[in-house]
């Protein structure tokens, strides 16, 4: 029985002494990988085709308004507010490219994180300061991805909200103008 306890203690000591010195960094990389995965899923839920269709509709509506709206008539305040809100759709022209660029950045960062994790698990990095530097660089990269992903998500939600509330009003103006002129 004494030999079993001594053997178990030696085995536990051996496991603890041989554990990876970068366990904390490996855990941090795992968290970063989860964050990047969440950003990727968030982006995949954003419909760039829907945004493109909103922009096309904006162009059609505004073309009719510019052509048929009488400039010297008194513009009611509601129309002015709605038209200003609707301009936000026009500003979203770079949405699709922004989404695609961020997805490329995510793919690159996922590879970098996987490589860093492998290097840490295999103890291929000999210096803890170097490991900390690499981890800090990847943390910065992931934080930038999170900021841009949240901004794209917020912009998408705003666009959908504007389209849902303002587009019907603007379309009714277009319909009225088409009937009059």
Task: List each model region and its residues.
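Generic signature of mature, soluble extracytoplasmic domains
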Residues: 63-66, 70-111
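Sec-dependent signal peptide recognition
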Residues: 2-11
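C-terminal motif of bacterial Sec signal peptides marking the signal peptidase cleavage site
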Residues: 14-17
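Immediate post-signal-peptide N-terminus of mature secreted/exported proteins
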Residues: 19-83
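Non-membrane alpha-helical secondary structure
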Residues: 43, 47-53, 57, 87, ...
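Short amphipathic alpha-helical patches
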Residues: 59-67, 78, 82-85, 126-129, ...
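Extracytoplasmic electrostatic interaction patches
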Residues: 95-181
